[in-house]
Amino acid sequence: MKTLDLPELSADAAPEFVDAVSAKTWLENVPLANVGAAQQQLLAQLQEFNRYTTKAVSRLAALEVVREAVQFVEIEQARRFTNRALPMAEQESSVFDDTLALWEEMHLGYLRCLQGVIDDEPGIRAEAATVCQRALSYTGLKMFHRHRAYRQVPAHEWRALHEGYARAEELGVAEKPVKDYLNRDVNDTSPRIAYIRALLLGMANPNELSQRQLTFVAFLLERWAEKVEIAAEAPEEDVPPLIIDLQSDICPEREGPEAVEPRYLDVKRLAKSLRNRIGLLRKGESPAKLALGEDCVQPSCEQLLVFLYRQWCQARQPRAAERKRSADPVQACNDIAAIHYYVSGHVFKQPGEAKELTSAQRDQIAAFGRVSTRDEDDYSVVHGYVLEHWQIEDESSQGIKMVRRAGNPGKRYTHGQLIGVRPADSKSFMLGQIRWLMQNDAGDLYAGVRLLAGLPAATAVRPTGLNVMGAKYVQALSLTAVQALNAPPSLVLPSGWYKPKRVVEVYVEGDVKVRLTEMIERGSDQIGRAHV
């Protein structure tokens, strides 16, 4: 069996633990209450330990002792870079890098144990399944935390995952049962199950999922990954099989490039479990009774299961609107006030309010025949409005995939956020909503934007009623009806404005009272879009 490509060991390495006994003693002095300091100590000592020459059985025993402490600090530190806007702030990025580095040191430690298995070191062959499962699990944890941070999984991680499973197959332990007491609920696992968990999470379009949804998918896979089999021959199915190439560096696909060393995922049992639960949810059964967890509520639970069924168990459906490749520039901005400014082309002022000219403005008219627009030009700078420069990668009538390169300045973004976009060949802005986000290690920010139906216009709204007499207008946006899409006219309103059947005043060349009939959706920035 081929030797693993691992860093050189060092004769001057001097870790503070070298086996299970010394690891337990050392851990007693690690300040786990201070997770930042504990993470740094664990990282430093594991780096030193992974340079140290010792027997594979001693290395395995020490790693098994420290892994619970590692798991604890990693989960706690992840709170500092998840549920954050992108791109990451410097401090968030630093914690993220340290978290990945610690997972990688655990992975490297188990790879050194695996090398001991390959070299037939005394006492380690019986632990081959555990070693393979742990190595695959830590590759999966690195991937999972990239998904949670909406960071791109690099090709070398996919290659490491496939190679890890290939080693388990070569050793004949891919299906051998292993206990992992760090799992949340199900302790029974195997190298195959650890591999499947990482594969299916990567196939679930994680850049599109919320943190709650990602946690739920991980919860499901701990229970259901065992339902997916791996075969050397394609299973008999009506849809193209899911193909893994053990010599590749990509996620499995149904109709991807020809595989050099193919394996096939049989998802029939998984598909049956998903279909059964979707059917029972539609009949009114509660998610908790279907073992879907107390946190899973309808209708979002059913919607997510349907989404996962499509990703894992169905052939890729053709897009509703054809996409075309592009490299055209596009301008973008977020925040309703900034979008209003750029859509209207001028500073927002209270509608219908006649203002007396200042002496400076009268002087400008006398000298130049008009009022200077310099104050308006400076307005966007003063208020932090930025027209960002992005580049389109592909587009359709319904959406845009675009990228903002690391060197281009811009705001931070979150899923569901309102965005205004203006392609280079367009004179006007379109409104959209961020559907997915991903940042790569170079700092480039990728976004998928779903375009909202209708032509946008800058408008203003104010409340009605006796208690709000004299209320001022605030910025809002309107969208025209689109008959072809059965989309009625709608308003994009600031946070907190929507109430069922609420009547508001909209300024359209005069005050017009409109009734809000339905909330279409609420963005992550709390901006709502309502039918009128």
Placement of each model-derived feature along the sequence:
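Generic N-terminal leader/targeting and pre-domain segments
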Residues: M1-L171
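Generic hydrophobic, helix-prone segments enriched in Leu/Val/Ile
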Residues: L46, T99, E105-L114, L220-L221, ...
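Extended, domain-scale alpha-helical bundle/helix-rich regions
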Residues: A168-E353
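Short strand-loop-strand
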Residues: W312-S428, Q433-D441, Y446-A458, G465-R529
